[in-house]
């Protein structure tokens, strides 16, 4: 793997059974990222079960299973490279904690592949109000995944019909435009994961009416997202250690800005001020750390007891914002009844977890257009998009999504389920900060 290529995290989204695993399994197999002997082995196992079409999907599913069983296997499967980029494939949805990981995890997606099935009835189910195609597209956009490639898959089930392709493409363009995607920048690729059409190479004999890129080529259409070096420093803390002979060492990932040895920093909410004595990443000393670096840094003048996971470090000249309250735009993914003002679930934002109250429902948005459907609604329910005023029940750092994307994305959870996901539009600073 070449180290010089920029690295992108790719998430694969779309309705269940539309062929996400099979398509990615096929791609990894065709470009040589998977040992062909494994595919052979899966083929034999799949045949025995009468499910031969599953052999490519098993590439990913077997790995998931083995990972869940705690067997360490080579995650090289989840990595592949194109001419321009080095990709890490993030667990596709269907994974229980997918939404939470998408927001709080290191698995922050940069770009997405949306897979939809061309099969009669399947496409319609995915794009229906209850379908995952719609939900995942909303979620991806809400979570700041601004670049997308679309695979219109299972084209073999409709005899590679140009009419069916156009019909689906036009419906998707409507959905994607409504959510806020720039549709003229999105490639729509007719694929068959099962027959290997337009996956790693163009297949004009099957789709003579299509003259665009194959899936593998389309991944190079992505633009590299800017790494926010010129923004003020923000480091959400993951852990804090006290090391004998060194002192207090917070650990976290630099999200924005640059941290240098000798810098004066403040860690909020506790208002702990200190000087950076040393920085290291994976046991290698650094003079400075930039966005994307996972680091431990020794701070003089701060005790371990003052800090905890969820605190955020910044420079004393631009301290992280502690929120009295904040306004967010959310999408309700799951709720058994309805949400009204006063509801107090749990807020997950960067590495922090605190109880939060829905203080006021300001507007309900039309999920089809994003325009205001209702001012000051009494309640919101599953499938709704809304603007809400939130009040954290404990001090927590919250930043505007427009200024600090990684600290302005959040999930709302209750009893182990993700209720909603959203972005911060505005923050009212807490007094005394």
From Swiss-Prot:
Region G4, residue ranges: 153-156
Record-listed E.C. numbers: 3.6.5.3
Enzymatic reactions: GTP + H2O = GDP + phosphate + H(+)
Annotated InterPro entries: EFTu-like_2, G_TR_CS, GTP-eEF1A_C, P-loop_NTPase, Small_GTP-bd, T_Tr_GTP-bd_dom, TRAFAC_GTPase_members, Transl_B-barrel_sf
Residues annotated as binding Mg(2+): 21
Superkingdom, natural source: Archaea
Domain tr-type G: 5-227
G1: annotated segments: 14-21
Segments for region (G3): 91-94
GO molecular function: GTP binding; GTPase activity; translation elongation factor activity
Pfam families noted in UniProt: GTP-eEF1A_C (PF22594), GTP_EFTU (PF00009), GTP_EFTU_D2 (PF03144)
Record localization: Cytoplasm
GO cellular component, one term: cytoplasm
Record-stated family: Belongs to the TRAFAC class translation factor GTPase superfamily. Classic translation factor GTPase family. EF-Tu/EF-1A subfamily.
UniProt function note: GTP hydrolase that promotes the GTP-dependent binding of aminoacyl-tRNA to the A-site of ribosomes during protein biosynthesis.
Full protein name: Elongation factor 1-alpha
Recorded name of the encoding gene: tuf
């Amino acid at each position: 793997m070449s180290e010089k290529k920029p690295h992108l995290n790719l998430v694969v989204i779309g309705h269940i059974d539309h062929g996400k695993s099979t398509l990615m399994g096929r791609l990894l197999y065709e470009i040589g990222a998977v040992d062909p002997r494994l595919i052979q082995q899966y083929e034999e196992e799949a045949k025995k079960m009468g499910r031969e079409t599953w052999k490519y999907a098993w590439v990913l599913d077997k790995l998931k299973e083995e990972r869940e069983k705690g067997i360490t296997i080579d995650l090289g499967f989840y990595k592949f490279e194109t001419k321009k980029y080095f990709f890490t494939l993030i667990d596709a949805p269907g994974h229980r904690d997918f939404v939470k990981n998408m927001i709080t995890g290191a698995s922050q997606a940069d770009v997405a592949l949306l897979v939809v099935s061309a099969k009669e009835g399947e496409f319609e189910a995915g794009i229906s109000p209850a379908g995952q195609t719609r939900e995942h597209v909303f979620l991806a956009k809400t979570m700041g995944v601004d670049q997308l490639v679309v695979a219109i898959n299972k084209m073999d089930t409709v005899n590679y019909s140009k009419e069916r392709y156009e019909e689906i493409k036009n419906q998707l363009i409507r959905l994607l435009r409504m959510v806020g995607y720039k549709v003229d920048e999105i490639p729509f690729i007719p694929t068959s994961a099962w027959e290997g059409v337009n996956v790693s190479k163009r297949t004009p004999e099957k789709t003579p009416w299509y003259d665009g890129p194959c899936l593998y080529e389309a991944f190079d259409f992505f633009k590299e997202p800017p790494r926010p070096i010129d923004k003020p420093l923000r480091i959400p803390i993951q852990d804090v250690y006290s090391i004998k002979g060194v002192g207090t060492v917070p650990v976290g990932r630099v999200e924005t800005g640059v941290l240098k040895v000798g810098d004066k920093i403040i860690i909020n909410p506790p208002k702990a001020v200190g000087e950076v004595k040393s920085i290291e990443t994976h046991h290698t000393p650094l003079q400075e750390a930039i966005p994307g670096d996972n680091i431990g840094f020794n701070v003089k003048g701060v005790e371990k007891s003052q800090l905890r996971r969820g605190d955020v470090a910044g420079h004393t000249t631009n301290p992280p914002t502690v929120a009295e309250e904040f306004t967010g735009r959310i999408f309700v993914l799951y709720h058994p009844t309805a949400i009204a003002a006063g509801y107090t679930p749990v807020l997950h934002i960067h590495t922090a977890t605190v109880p939060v109250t829905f203080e006021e429902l300001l507007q309900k948005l039309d999920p089809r257009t994003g325009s205001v459907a209702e001012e000051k609604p009494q309640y919101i329910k599953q499938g709704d998009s809304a603007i809400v005023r939130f009040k954290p029940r404990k001090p927590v750092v919250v930043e505007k999504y427009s200024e600090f994307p990684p600290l302005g994305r959040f999930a709302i959870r209750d009893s182990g389920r993700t209720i909603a996901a959203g972005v911060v539009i505005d923050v009212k600073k807490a007094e005394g900060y």
